[in-house]
Amino acid sequence: MMIPVRCFTCGTVIGEHWDEFKQRARDGNEDPGEVLDDLGIKRHCCRRMMVSHRDLVDVVAPYQ
C-alpha cells in the first residue's frame, strides 16, 4: 500500500520524505542510512518505517 503519513510509534510526519528516499536510496546507488540522515529522519522507529515499506498498490489494485 502507500507509505503512512506518520510514524506508527512516535507520530512524526514521514510521508513527505518517501518520494525522495525512494528515488535516492532504492532507485539510485546511495546508502539508505545516509539518505535518511540527509532527510533529517533520526529516530529508529521512523527509519524502520521508511526502510521496511514496500509499495503494494500495484499488486492489490487488480483485486479492487
UniProtKB/Swiss-Prot annotation:
Residues annotated for Zn(2+) binding in this entry: 7, 10, 45-46
Alphabetical list of Pfam families matching this protein: RNA_pol_N
Keyword tags: Cytoplasm, DNA-directed RNA polymerase, Metal-binding, Nucleotidyltransferase, Transcription, Transferase, Zinc
GO BP, sorted A to Z: DNA-templated transcription
InterPro entries referenced in this protein's UniProt entry, alphabetically: RNA_pol_su_RPB10, RNA_pol_suN_Zn-BS, RPABC5/Rpb10
Keyword Zinc: yes
Subunit and partners: Part of the RNA polymerase complex.
Function: DNA-dependent RNA polymerase (RNAP) catalyzes the transcription of DNA into RNA using the four ribonucleoside triphosphates as substrates.
HAMAP family listed in its UniProt record: RNApol_arch_Rpo10 (MF_00250)
Protein name in the entry: DNA-directed RNA polymerase subunit Rpo10
Annotated organism of origin: Haloquadratum walsbyi (strain DSM 16790 / HBSQ001)
Lineage: Archaea, Methanobacteriati, Methanobacteriota, Stenosarchaea group, Halobacteria
Gene this chain is encoded by: rpo10
